[in-house]
């Protein structure tokens, strides 16, 4: 069903960069050469290889909990994926030209995978995006479409009417035609006609990964086939060490339009020629126990979730849910996207230890879309490690252990970076910081993207940074400026926050994540710490999501008063800060990105415009 509504270069062979052997005295963290080799030059070639070598092997199993609450399994083989992707590719070339973008706005499911693979087979540039919610306009989708200006939008019959309303937003220039909207499931995917995979070009660019950011200034990271394949090689090497391949059977509920969801759910299974078990994010949110159950029942060995996913699994998975199930085969559960909470990891490992989940399976990881997805994690076979740092020292940019018994910021280690070259840099002077001094994390490697789509100025500032007087063995550039603050402490990487999100209260710097972690020890739910202006300076405000628990209004009022007192006391004691306002709201009130990170600037706007519905108004 259809309704009317350049990047181009030769394919590149992906190889792991061989980094210099020179060491930086303060922080010798050069990436090492991978043990893995990958001769294919594009993701399309890798799909063709999987279909050729393992045509009848299950490629993707999607568990549909909407059709059946017990889970209805849909399966496609590698031959079917390749065949259907080729049919989609031929359809695309009816309307597309070389270098065109093709947006994917479809529900989580096999059709999304076929659509994405079809764009790659056609040699066009994929733009994976979320499906819009019915009746709710999503400005982020509109902005990404306007920025990428696709000639075609791929979707499914069930949502084509809603998706078609977004097509006019995809016109980057005045007078440009709206893109064609194609429902993938309405194509004759079972056609037996002859198909020629060699007719399509193999450009260097694979897809645009839109990052969580401003709705008015979307950032589409241009990722090449080389970037993606390189990062897969790095990821496999760092997560599983000397093994020849990534653990089989990944389980994922992460959305396909998210960088880790795309990598773990779609790309890694293809590169490894194994079977992925998938479900939708909504299926997980409705019943978090499904995640652990799928890991056990499919004997999966690798999965991933942001911090809130671990919290939900702990709170909403019962012993009855896990009866007779075993997690002893799980080797890797990646946690990242948002700041990793040490207490959350401890609760998670304790909760599932009775079902043989090893604490060494939990892998705190650092990455970002600008580096494809992955940058660093600690080595395999090691339980998560954390260090409690002195708050006051961190506020002045120094990492020192908190004295015994004193309050501090408990930060998780991301190990010594091996896949990429990492430096900690003073963002003002652009000179390397010594170990123990907080600075901006700069990254270098073949996994670093080509830049931001149609934004040369921001590309130059972010992807082309150069060091001033680099240390021996360190190149001048180009470097990726991540915008993340971190420190090398005892040879390992720790993340302290974001440059743009530092709270300046009473003239001192404070990391909002530290304050949020203190509050979460009391409340357990989502929280955001923000600084809002008053007449003379900025004041600290905390917004806390709470479930209603009081049986009567009076009980609820007393509970809210107690929480407010405990939060104010804990912040004063741990951070030597006075909280100007403790706002308590219902779950789901705090704005978040597609990956679950709190949107601090949006929270400030809502607070200043009195848009939060406060539970504590009654207290």
From Swiss-Prot:
PANTHER family on file: DISCO-INTERACTING PROTEIN 2, DISCO-INTERACTING PROTEIN 2 DIP2 -RELATED
Please name the GO terms of the biological process aspect recorded for this protein, alphabetically.
Answer: Actinobacterium-type cell wall biogenesis; fatty acid biosynthetic process; lipid biosynthetic process; phthiocerol biosynthetic process
In what pathway does it function? Answer: Lipid metabolism; fatty acid biosynthesis
Q: Which InterPro entries match?
A: AMP-bd_C, AMP-bd_C_sf, AMP-dep_synth/lig_dom, ANL_N_sf, FAAL/FAAC
**SUPFAM superfamilies noted in UniProt:** Acetyl-CoA synthetase-like
* UniProt keyword terms in alphabetical order: ATP-binding, Fatty acid metabolism, Ligase, Lipid metabolism, Nucleotide-binding
Family as reported in the entry's similarity comment: Belongs to the ATP-dependent AMP-binding enzyme family.
| One Gene Ontology molecular-function label | ATP binding
Q: What is its EC number?
A: 6.2.1.51
CDD domains for the chain: FAAL
* Catalytic activity annotation: 17-(4-hydroxyphenyl)heptadecanoate + holo-[(phenol)carboxyphthiodiolenone synthase] + ATP = 17-(4-hydroxyphenyl)heptadecanoyl-[(phenol)carboxyphthiodiolenone synthase] + AMP + diphosphate; 19-(4-hydroxyphenyl)nonadecanoate + holo-[(phenol)carboxyphthiodiolenone synthase] + ATP = 19-(4-hydroxyphenyl)nonadecanoyl-[(phenol)carboxyphthiodiolenone synthase] + AMP + diphosphate; dodecanoate + ATP + H(+) = dodecanoyl-AMP + diphosphate
Please name the gene that encodes this protein.
fadD29
What phylogenetic lineage does the species belong to?
Answer: Bacteria, Bacillati, Actinomycetota, Actinomycetes, Mycobacteriales
**Phenotype upon loss of function:** Disruption of the gene abolishes the production of phenolic glycolipid (PGL). Mutant can still produce phthiocerol dimycocerosate (DIM A) and phthiodiolone dimycocerosate (DIM B).
Say which species the protein is native to. Mycobacterium tuberculosis (strain ATCC 25618 / H37Rv)
| Name the record gives this protein | 4-hydroxyphenylalkanoate adenylyltransferase
**What is the documented function of this protein?**
Catalyzes the activation of long-chain fatty acids as acyl-adenylates (acyl-AMP), which are then transferred to the multifunctional polyketide synthase PpsA for further chain extension. Involved in the biosynthesis of phenolphthiocerol, which is an important intermediate in the biosynthesis of phenolic glycolipid (PGL), also called mycosid B.
């Amino acid at each position: 069903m259809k309704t009317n509504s350049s990047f181009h270069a030769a394919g590149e062979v992906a190889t792991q960069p061989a980094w210099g052997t020179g060491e930086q005295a303060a922080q010798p963290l050069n990436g090492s050469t991978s043990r893995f080799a990958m001769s294919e030059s594009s993701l399309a070639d890798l799909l063709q290889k999987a279909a050729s070598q393992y045509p009848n092997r299950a490629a993707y199993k999607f568990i549909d909990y909407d059709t059946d609450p017990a889970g209805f399994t849909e399966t496609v083989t590698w031959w079917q994926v390749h065949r259907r992707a080729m049919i989609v590719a031929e359809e695309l070339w009816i309307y597309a030209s070389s270098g065109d973008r093709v947006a994917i706005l479809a529900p989580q499911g096999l059709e999304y995978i076929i659509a994405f693979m079809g764009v790659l087979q056609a040699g066009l540039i994929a733009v994976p995006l979320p499906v819009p919610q019915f009746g709710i306009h999503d400005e982020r989708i509109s902005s990404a479409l306007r920025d990428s200006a696709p000639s075609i939008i791929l979707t499914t019959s069930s949502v084509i009417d809603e998706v078609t309303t977004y097509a006019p937003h995809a016109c980057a220039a005045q007078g440009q035609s709206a893109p064609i909207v194609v429902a993938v499931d309405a194509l004759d995917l079972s056609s037996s006609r002859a198909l020629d995979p060699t007719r399509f070009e193999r450009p260097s660019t694979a897809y645009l990964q839109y990052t969580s950011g401003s709705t008015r200034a979307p950032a589409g990271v241009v990722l090449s086939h080389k970037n993606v394949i390189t990062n897969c090689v790095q990821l496999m090497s760092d997560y599983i060490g000397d093994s020849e391949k990534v653990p089989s059977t990944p389980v994922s509920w992460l959305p396909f339009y998210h960088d880790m969801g795309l990598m773990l759910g779609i790309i890694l299974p293809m590169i490894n020629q194994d079977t992925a078990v998938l479900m939708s994010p909504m299926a997980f949110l409705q019943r978090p126990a499904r995640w652990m159950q799928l890991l056990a029942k499919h004997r999966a060995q690798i999965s991933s979730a942001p911090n809130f996913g671990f919290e939900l699994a702990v709170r909403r998975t019962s012993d009855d849910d896990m009866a007779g199930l075993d997690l002893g085969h799980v080797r890797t559960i990646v946690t990242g996207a948002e700041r990793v909470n040490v207490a959350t990891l401890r609760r998670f490992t304790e909760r599932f230890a009775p079902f043989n989940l090893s604490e060494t399976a939990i892998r705190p990881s650092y990455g970002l879309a600008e580096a494809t997805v992955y940058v660093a994690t600690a080595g395999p076979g090691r339980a998560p490690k954390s260090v409690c740092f002195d708050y006051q020292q961190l506020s002045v940019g120094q990492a020192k252990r908190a004295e015994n018994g004193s309050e501090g910021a408990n930060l998780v280690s991301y190990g010594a970076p091996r896949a990429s070259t990492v430096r900690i840099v003073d963002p003002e002077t652009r000179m390397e910081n010594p170990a123990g001094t907080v600075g901006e994390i700069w990254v270098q490697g073949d996994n670093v993207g080509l830049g931001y789509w149609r934004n040369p100025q921001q590309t130059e500032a972010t992807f082309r940074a150069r060091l001033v007087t680099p240390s021996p063995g360190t190149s001048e550039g180009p470097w990726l400026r991540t915008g993340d603050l971190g420190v090398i402490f005892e040879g390992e990487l720790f993340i302290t926050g974001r440059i743009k999100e530092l709270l300046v209260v009473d003239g001192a710097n404070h990391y909002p994540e530290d304050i949020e972690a203190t509050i979460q020890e009391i409340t357990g739910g989502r929280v955001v710490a923000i600084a809002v202006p008053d007449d003379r300076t900025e004041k600290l405000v905390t917004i806390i999501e709470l479930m209603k628990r009081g049986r009567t209004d009076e009980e609820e009022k007393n509970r809210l008063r107690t929480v407010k007192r405990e939060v104010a006391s804990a912040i004063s004691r741990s951070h030597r800060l006075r909280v100007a306002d403790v706002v308590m709201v219902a779950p789901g009130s705090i704005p978040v990105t597609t990956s679950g990170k709190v949107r601090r600037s949006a929270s400030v706007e809502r607070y200043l415009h009195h848009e939060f519905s406060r539970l504590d108004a009654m207290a």
